[in-house]
């Protein structure tokens, strides 16, 4: 029983290490259409390919991108990753139809959940 308690505590620590800041434990980060792909470390120290559709995580609010996992609406934006691969630079349409420049640090929206990208 003592051994299982230690294993549980260690897995909790590993989970906390991946909370937010996905780019610290993921590499080969790329963006295509509305998805981020990366190779992320899992809780065993192995690395595996994963991806996430940002329409589940981001919203275009008046031409500005925000993290919004509860009610996402990542529409009407043309985007690309910045040089550090964790910032998404976009031009998003506001309510008047005007394209506005906006960017968001994906480390504030995405997390590495045991090798899988999550909002």
Regions flagged by a language model, labelled:
Residues 1-19:
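Fungal secretory targeting signals
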Residues 18-119:
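A structural motif
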């Amino acid at each position: 029983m003592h051994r299982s308690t230690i294993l549980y505590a260690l897995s909790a620590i590993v989970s906390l290490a991946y909370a937010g800041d996905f780019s610290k434990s993921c590499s080969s980060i790329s963006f295509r259409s509305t998805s981020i792909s990366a190779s992320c470390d899992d809780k065993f120290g192995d690395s595996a390919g994963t991806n996430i559709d940002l329409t589940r995580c981001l919203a275009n609010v008046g031409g500005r991108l925000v993290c919004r996992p509860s009610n996402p609406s990542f529409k009407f934006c043309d985007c690309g990753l910045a040089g550090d691969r964790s910032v998404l630079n976009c031009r998003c349409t506001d309510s008047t139809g005007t394209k506005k420049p906006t960017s968001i640090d994906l480390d504030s929206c995405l997390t590495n959940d045991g090798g899988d990208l999550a909002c």
